[in-house]
C-alpha cells in the first residue's frame, strides 16, 4: 500500500545531516530548491539528538473544547501501525495561535512503542526533559505548559506544516536543522550524491584554510561546475 525504501537506505540516510540531504536532493533536480522542507518556524526542540528518518503518519489537532464526536485514539493507533516502520508523526494544529500540547511524556512513550521516531507539528509540545530522555524527537512551533482540550480532528489526510504539505506514507528526515521530505525515486542515490558534493566543497574549504590562499585561487576553484 505504501512505498518504501530498503533498510540499508534508511540506515544510510539516518547517518546524514539535514543540510547534506537537501543539497543532495538539489543535485538530482527533482524539485525546486525552495520547496520540500519545513520552514524554520518548525524547529528541533532537542538539537543534540541524532537525525531521525521515517514514513509520515498525518493528522489534525485542536486544543479548543470540542463539540460532538472527535476522532478515536484507537482509530489513530490503527492508522499508525498500518504505515511501515519507522514512523514519523506529522500533526497540523488548527488553533491560531497554538494552545495546548498534544505531545508530552505519555504521548512520546505511546508513539515510540508504536514505532515512531519523532513528531513534527505546528502546534506545541511539553514534558521536555522526559521526552528528551526517551529519545523521542520533537519538531515543533513552540512549547506549552498545558494540554488544554487537545484532541484529534482528522487523521490520514494531507496536512501542511511549516509550509510543507505531507501525506501519510511520505519519507521524512529531521535533525537539529529542521525537517525535509525525501523523494522516493532518488532516496537510495542520496548517500553517493552526498559524497560527491562533499568532495566538491572540500576543494573550497581546504583552499580557504590553507596558507597559500589567494583571491585568484578562490576564483579558479569557483569555476569548477557545481554538482548541485
Put a short name on every predicted segment:
Residues 178-180:
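Channel- or pocket-lining gating/hinge segments that regulate access to a cavity or pore
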Amino acid at each position: 500500500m505504501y512505498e518504501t525504501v530498503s533498510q540499508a537506505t534508511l540506515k544510510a540516510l539516518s547517518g546524514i545531516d539535514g543540510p547534506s540531504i537537501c543539497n543532495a536532493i538539489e543535485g538530482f533536480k527533482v524539485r525546486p530548491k525552495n520547496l520540500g522542507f519545513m520552514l524554520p518556524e518548525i524547529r528541533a526542540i532537542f538539537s543534540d539528538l541524532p537525525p531521525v528518518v521515517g514514513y509520515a503518519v498525518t493528522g489534525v489537532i485542536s486544543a479548543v473544547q470540542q463539540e460532538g464526536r472527535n476522532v478515536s485514539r484507537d482509530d489513530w493507533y490503527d492508522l499508525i501501525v498500518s504505515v511501515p516502520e519507522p514512523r514519523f508523526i506529522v500533526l497540523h494544529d488548527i488553533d491560531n495561535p497554538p494552545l495546548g500540547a498534544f505531545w508530552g511524556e505519555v504521548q512520546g512513550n505511546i508513539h515510540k512503542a508504536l514505532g515512531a521516531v519523532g513528531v513534527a507539528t505546528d502546534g506545541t509540545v511539553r514534558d521536555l526533559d522526559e521526552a528528551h530522555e526517551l529519545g523521542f524527537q520533537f519538531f515543533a512551533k513552540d512549547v506549552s505548559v498545558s494540554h488544554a482540550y487537545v484532541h484529534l480532528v482528522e487523521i490520514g489526510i494531507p496536512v501542511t506544516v511549516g509550509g510543507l504539505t505531507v501525506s501519510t506514507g511520505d519519507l521524512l528526515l529531521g535533525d537539529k536543522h529542521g525537517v525535509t521530505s525525501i523523494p522516493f525515486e532518488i532516496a537510495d542515490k542520496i548517500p553517493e550524491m552526498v559524497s560527491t558534493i562533499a568532495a566538491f566543497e572540500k576543494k573550497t574549504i581546504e583552499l580557504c584554510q590553507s596558507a597559500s590562499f589567494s583571491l585568484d585561487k578562490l576564483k579558479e576553484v569557483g569555476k569548477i561546475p557545481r554538482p548541485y
